Amino acid sequence: MFRYTRFEKARIIGARALQIALGAPVLVDVPEGSTPLQAAIIEFEKGIIPITVIRPS
């Protein structure tokens, strides 16, 4: 998996949690009663968040 800075990680998880909260489908099986933030963290840990980071060269 690609190595992210703590700022990139926070932005990715936060953006994905917002998407999930607004109705986007969750791409992994999460326990019943999980919050959008918990679902986003699980997706991040499994490496399947559909967000790309582009760094300047």
UniProtKB/Swiss-Prot annotation:
Enzyme type, top EC level: transferase
Major location category of this protein: cytoplasm
EC numbers: 2.7.7.6
Top-rank taxon, per record: Archaea
Assembly and binders: Part of the RNA polymerase complex.
Subcellular location: Cytoplasm
Protein name in UniProt: DNA-directed RNA polymerase subunit Rpo6
Substrates-to-products reaction catalysed: RNA(n) + a ribonucleoside 5'-triphosphate = RNA(n+1) + diphosphate
CC annotations in GO: cytoplasm; DNA-directed RNA polymerase complex
Organism placement in taxonomy: Archaea, Methanobacteriati, Methanobacteriota, Thermococci, Thermococcales
UniProt cross-references to InterPro entries, sorted A to Z: DNA-dir_RNA_polK_14-18kDa_CS, Pol_omega/Rpo6/RPB6, RPB6/omega-like_sf, Rpo6/Rpb6
PROSITE patterns from the UniProt entry: RNA_POL_K_14KD
Keyword match Cytoplasm: yes
Keyword Cytoplasm recorded: yes
Any one GO BP annotation for this protein: transcription by RNA polymerase II
HAMAP family, per the entry: RNApol_arch_Rpo6 (MF_00192)
Function: DNA-dependent RNA polymerase (RNAP) catalyzes the transcription of DNA into RNA using the four ribonucleoside triphosphates as substrates.
A GO molecular-function annotation: DNA binding
Family, as annotated: Belongs to the archaeal Rpo6/eukaryotic RPB6 RNA polymerase subunit family.
Record keywords: Cytoplasm, DNA-directed RNA polymerase, Nucleotidyltransferase, Transcription, Transferase
